[in-house]
Structure formats: C-alpha cells, structure tokens
C-alpha cells in the first residue's frame, strides 16, 4: 500500500488514548516484539510460526545486513500494561536512490512487521511509524514491507484459508481494511501462482523445451553446491541485472546474499536451482525451495528440546508436497525474446521433473509476480 503523500494520522478516537506506544531499545524489547506475533496469531490455524531464533536475528543489528543500509525503529503498543501490537518503521537508503517510478525513491519510508489486536491499536501504531518517518524527513510511505522488499512485501488479501509455503507471509484478514481506512491505497498487486506439477506442459511447450535441449548454444544446469559462493555470485549478478527496471527493485548487497545464503544452504538442493547459459554465458536462473513450512509448522517456533532432531531429519531427506519458486530472472538484454521464454520453460520443466521424481512433490508455487509482468504471468498460466 502507498500511504498519503504526506504521512499523516487523522481521526484518532477516544479509545486510542488508552494505548501507549514505546520504542524498542534493547535485546529484551526485541524478544517481546517477536513474542507478540506468536500470541496474536495463536488462534490462526494457518499461521506458520517462524523459528524464534531466526525471527530475533532478523531484528538484530550486526546480524542482519539490512541494517548496514537502513535505519530501523521497532515499536510496541500496550494497553493497561499488556502488549497488544507491534510495528517497525524503517528507511532503506538504497531504496531512496531508486527512481520514484519504480515505487521507492527519495522521501519514501516504510513500515512493516505489523501485528495488532484491534483497529484502535492499528491506528496508534501506524501513527507512531508515520511520525518517526516524518521526523526523518520522509514524505511518503510504502507499506507493509517486512523489513526488506526482498523479504515479505505487501499485505495478504486472498488465501487466508490455507497456510503459506516457505518464505511467504500470512497476515490477519482484517488488516487490509484497517490500512485503507487510514487513507492507504493499493500501490501494486503481487500474485503467486499455485500449480499442479504432476500435469505436463501442453505439447507446444514440450516441443519448445525439446528444441532447447537439442540446441548446442543452450545449457541449463544444476547449481554446484561445492562452489556455493561462486554460484551465489552468478545468481546475484543475474538477478540485479534482470530485475533492475522492475517496480520495487532495490539492489541486493553481497552481504545480504551471504546472509541469506547461509540461512538457506541447508535447504538448498542442487537439482532444484538451475542456471541457464547461452553461448557459455550465464543469462538466467531459477531458484526453487522445498516447502520448509511443512516441517516447522508443528514446532510452533521452537527447536528445543526435540524439534531440532525432527528438523535435521527432514532436511537430510525432504519429501515436501509443495515447492516454491521465490526467484527467477533472465538478463535484461534477452527479456521479451523467444529465447527468454524458452529458457524459462526449460528451467521450469527440468525442476518439475526433479521435484516429482526425487522428492515426491505434487504442488508448486511461483511468486511473487508483479501484476504488470505479463510475460511471467503468461508462463505461469501455461
């Protein structure tokens, strides 16, 4: 959602006066900030609690490299001394340097990690975030973004009736209405596509894939986990080039790639991440992850005392029903070409085969996909 051009808060009610907003300033406060999400979502059978240690690490300067290029302030809302909500306000300095037409740009701040018990709490929290952003010179809000645009952007508006797959958000269905009541309007629609991967591509697409397999100038290969850092660098370079003109794009830093790579390395399977080469040069990639949420959902956010054994066993031999494609891209100079579509179909098909034969998966999700990315939406609809 995009907020008013000038972040502002209007229409406070008497009940708002019962709510106090306090900034988080230390480790204890960050732990309380994390706990709020578990308590407020405990009633939702489709909410997947993240591992607490990862949720805390996300909020900790010195551990999450997002803080190297961002100013972040966390807030907790209390009523009668009891925590009833939370929000983060943040300014990504890399985002400030992007063109305004791409959604970010000078003067744009963000808030996210939002949870609230009721609408009055929501008003008070968003007012606090807007006041903090205004005090830092921001004139516009794009939210919710938690924390980076590469993590959990946006507010879920459809799909509350089933749990999210790995690295996808899940928020209370009431929130969107509360945001709109405060003057926020939709800035961009993001889609995720759910696919029955047991179904083969139509014959035309199968012929396109077969043609690519016979083309000596094309090579689609698995990543080599023994060269993890080098492969990650190839993907980073391709991603930053492929997505440079996309709405919401903010460059990913090498430190963020290393941080994310370290977290994902136990989950990475070489045969689920493809790099496409044309005439010997990497020009496209597709990253697919087994749905870790199937394993961690019953753990309710805790690894100890015995859940770490269950998680380790699952990671050694995952058999997820679902896979998710969080990232894919084709270098800019090939976009909108027949070759780009061919490479995309080839990567999807090769990973589809592996997901079925080696992991027993039956379902896939591709997303996020921007509403105006007609090429990718056409591929997902095929």
Positions of the model-derived regions?
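Short, Lys/Arg-enriched N-terminal segments with co-localized hydrophobic residues
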Residues: 1-13
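Acyltransferase donor/substrate-recognition loop-hinge adjacent to the catalytic core
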Residues: 15-19, 169-248, 272
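Catalytic cores of nucleotide-enabled group-transfer and carboxylate-activating enzymes in metabolic
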Residues: 27-30, 49-61, 66-86, 92-94, ...
